[in-house]
């Protein structure tokens, strides 16, 4: 009996050992070795596409500035944290009769280079604008050339024409001469800044511009009060000249993408940073 019991014990022990060995083998096959490269899912071509805008900037205020906002009074590090884009004045138009604190006698803004460079190196997209004030078509074309020559090396995301006053009999023809010359020089993204009343009074056509920027202030108390009173589709709304943002101790013009528009789509349209010369 003892012998039979001993044999049974050996057989049972062998069976248990075999089962434990099999379990270890299965476990080894199930759990990857730490030295074995992990399998990764390859991203689709669409998800691999490099983001052409910073989504964090989309909801922030957009400012427009000139030489009247002195670089020495701006903390670019702080202000850059509070804006989604900047539109910098490059040319002040032919109305400059003498040099002043913000403008050279030739019409070029004294601070445009500094403004553009300081915001761009902080990854804030920059567009540019010129105040349109020539007295005839020939002068309009000359201003367009000066504007493009000064701005294009910085590859701005957009070129804007700021039209606020009547400086020639047919302002629509003058504005078109400026726009057409700018386009002929190589600018592809060209927008128009204009008040709705002036646009209607002087029959300024927006058809050939690729974006429209309209000022409507309401109470002009630093906050959004009212949308532009127009049936014309617009992209950007300048809603106050009394805005205040950390990084600059004086008032700023504040702008927002039209509330009726797709915010990200319009932001991408106006502030997509070009990696080639497609905007310039």
Please place each PLM-identified region on the residue numbering:
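Positions that flank functional sites
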Residues: 93, 134, 197-198, 244
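Functionally critical loop-and-helix segments that line ligand-binding/catalytic clefts
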Residues: 43, 47-76, 210-280
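Extended hydrophobic/Leu-rich segments
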Residues: 12, 16-19, 267-271
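Hydrophobic membrane-insertion alpha-helices, especially the h-region
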Residues: 1-14
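Substrate-binding cleft of extracellular glycoside hydrolase catalytic domains
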Residues: 52-179, 183-185
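N-terminal, intrinsically disordered, polar/charged segments of Gram-positive cell-envelope systems
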Residues: 16-59
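Conserved beta-strand termini and adjacent loop/short-helix elements that scaffold enzyme active sites
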Residues: 131, 193-195, 239
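Catalytic domains of cell-wall/extracellular-matrix polysaccharide-remodeling enzymes
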Residues: 158-227
């Amino acid at each position: 009996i003892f012998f039979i019991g001993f044999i049974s014990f050996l057989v049972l022990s062998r069976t248990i050992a075999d089962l434990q060995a099999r379990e270890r083998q299965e476990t080894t096959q199930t759990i990857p070795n730490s030295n074995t490269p992990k399998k990764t899912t390859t991203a689709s071509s669409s998800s691999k596409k490099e983001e052409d805008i910073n989504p964090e900037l989309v909801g922030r205020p957009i400012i427009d500035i000139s030489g009247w906002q002195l670089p020495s009074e701006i903390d670019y590090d702080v202000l850059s944290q509070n804006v989604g884009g900047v539109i910098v004045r490059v040319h002040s138009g032919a109305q400059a009769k003498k040099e002043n604190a913000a403008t050279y006698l030739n019409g070029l803004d004294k601070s445009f280079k500094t403004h553009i460079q300081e915001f761009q190196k902080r990854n804030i997209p920059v567009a540019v604008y010129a105040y349109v004030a020539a007295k005839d078509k020939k002068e309009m074309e000359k201003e367009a050339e000066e504007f493009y020559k000064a701005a294009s090396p910085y590859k701005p995301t957009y070129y804007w024409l700021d039209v606020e006053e009547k400086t020639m009999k047919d302002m629509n023809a003058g504005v078109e001469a400026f726009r057409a010359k700018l386009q002929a020089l190589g600018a592809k993204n060209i927008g128009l800044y204009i008040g709705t009343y002036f646009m209607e009074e002087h029959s300024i056509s927006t058809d050939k511009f690729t974006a429209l920027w309209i000022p409507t202030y309401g109470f002009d108390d630093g906050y959004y009060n009212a949308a532009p009173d127009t049936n014309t589709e617009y992209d950007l709304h300048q809603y106050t000249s009394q805005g205040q943002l950390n990084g600059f101790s004086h008032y700023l013009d504040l702008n927002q993408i039209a509330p009726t528009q797709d915010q990200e789509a319009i932001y991408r349209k106006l502030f997509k940073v070009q990696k080639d010369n497609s905007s310039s």
